[in-house]
Amino acid sequence: MPSVSVTGKVYLAGAGPGDPGLITLRAAECLAEADLVLYDGLVNPLLLRRTRGICERTARTRRDGTTIVSQQEINERLIAEARAGKVVVRLKGGDPYIFGRGSEEAAALQAAGIPFEVIPGVTAATGAGEYAGFSFTHREISSAVAFVTGHEDPTRDASRLDFEALARFPGTLVFYMGLNRLTEICRQLIAAGMPETTPAAVVCHASLATQQVVDGTLATIPHEASKRQLKPPSLIVVGECVKQRAQLSWYEQLPLFGVSIGVTRPDEQADDVSSQIVRLGGEPVIMPMIEVGPVAEPDVPAIQETFERLHEFQWLVFTSVNGVSEFFRHLQRSGRDARALHAARIAAIGTSTALKLESFGIQADFVPAEFRAESLGAALAERAQGQNVLWVRASRGRDVLPGLLQDAGVHLEQLVVYENRDVAAFTSDVVARLKSGTLQWVGLSSPSIARQFAQLLKMAEIFPAELTTKIAAISSVTARAADDCGLTVECIARNSTWQGILDAIVSSRRLQSHHS
């Protein structure tokens, strides 16, 4: 019987200008379903975390916009992968049809008979304007806006741009990809009759923590941009709207704007913290210290045997989000659900763990005011005397609870539901940032993570005395562990959560700014 050809589909999707929160819901849905993602170098890497693990992530252009492979090669790859039955997302910075060459790819797909869909994105111009504080149209300032290429087809002998028409344009001009031609663009606009006092600005890395905005006039902006040594990607804005920046600028006022922060949580738990950092104007750098994985299959029967005896325990104690997730995964695997916990009271070490329990329909009966094992143990020693307590835990961790509870006559049993392993080394990017000082902060969320951070520094031949990266600790216990390793802790969270770490960094920066 002849095989049936199954054709996939290609989604030409806009990723927005940089901030990962600006991707559309439709594009995010397609990323989650994709078999393959081909993305531009201008795409924020955090967006790739929305894809499934089987996706091949292959950059087609570099961050500075230079080409790795030709447009023809990209077209051929899209067609070949779709013919192989794959769902392909072609992810482009900004909008696919606004100087994104998306229409060329769509035409190639149409000619080859490949189904495709175009998903608009927030344009780079829109993102740059609104994150920099420019309103391109305004009743009293500008009735029109023009998007203009600053980098035309290099194979053409003559320019298609009519600078005399642009000089007369009754509104805002936005030039894409024009930083290297900034002086020439300003010269031609002035030569065509636009006043040299016309406000102008350059926006680099729009909507990212590394965003830079330089403003001036047509006469001064080339020198100002050169003085700041601006780099692509960038846009040039020409028009009266540039004067609005003093009034409308908001992004640079965010409390963590321009601050890079190392997120040391396990990779699969880093996204929520990364989103918090982005919303505060910062740049998350995901650098997990430990890897979390399931227990070995031979150890699973012991977990199942414990589930047979859940009715024997008066208390269940959860000391991590991972412990909650893995406990309920094994519980469901055994054919049980939350009703199996009806006889026990539940203790959680912190709000994050308690919230994770709530996601499974369980309200914690007790959460200590101070999110430390010592506080949890002291409270349980009073509440659970003579009772059976099951501690759901990882293969490694602090062993404070057993001593505290057993001394109080509590019958403690430990149930290991997941493994945690140290990562082998920092990535090369993290090492480079630590050595260059471009990673400004790192958050340490447990004593074991503090010790592992110190160990990886040693492996990378970075000595604590040379480290310019500031350290924020989630608790005094974690701070002491860091101090024991020779690390200097800049601040300690009042609330022992990652939100507490970020709040501590904000407070530390404000205090430093006040004293400087």
Which residues are covered by each model-predicted region?
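Class I S-adenosyl-L-methionine
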Residues: 1-20, 25-122, 127, 227, ...
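Signature of uroporphyrinogen-III synthase
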Residues: 4, 18, 64, 70-74, ...
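Short beta-strand segments
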Residues: 12-14, 90-92, 119, 148-149, ...
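Short internal beta-strands
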Residues: 32-42, 199-204, 346-350, 470-475
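Short, well-ordered beta-strand core segments
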Residues: 35-37, 57, 135, 173, ...
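Glycine-rich beta-alpha junction loops
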Residues: 43, 151-152, 179-181, 204-209, ...
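Class I SAM-dependent methyltransferase SAM-binding "motif I" and its flanking Rossmann-like core
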Residues: 93-169, 214, 366-372, 428
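Conserved anion/nucleotide-ligand pocket segment
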Residues: 155-201
